[in-house]
Amino acid sequence: GIELELAIELICDSVKSINDIEEVSIEKARGRIIGEDIIATINQPPFDRSPLDGYALRSEDITGASKKNPIKLKVIDEVCAGGYTHKEVGKNETIRIMTGAKIPKGCDCVIRQESTDYGMETVEIYQEVKHHQNYCFEGEDITKGSKLINLGEKLSYIHIGIIASMGYEKVKVIR
């Protein structure tokens, strides 16, 4: 057998000190043990956004819409993924919107394009959509200031992606 004191000494020698930290680029951090808590620096998504391709609109304008009773709206703009518009949607207006685009002012929902005639200047809506339906809120996935990764976790590809999405270029890891 081995004496208790010697066993403790061997264990202590083999354990890396949490104080023995180095900073490395995130590209070299996979598989390493994180030496600090990783905190969200921004909200994700960073703004209210559309989860699908369709038309951003006011739900009150399409109450009662159906295939037999389509409601026609004026298309006033188009917003691509990651884009935005300064236009505000008014009564009986809509903006064509792609997945990931910022929800325009005045809109409280998005209708999927498959529930429309895909119109460019005017669009026929074939279905009701409720308030905040198909609507992703700012910070819905990650809230600024929340802890994303705990000190002592082994970093995987997933962790590295999260760290990168927060704008970190380097992280502290245990040597």
Show which residues each predicted segment covers:
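Short, low-complexity N-terminal leaders and the immediately following helix N-cap/first helix
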Residues: 1-69
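Short, glycine/charged-enriched hinge/interface segments at domain edges or termini
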Residues: 55-175
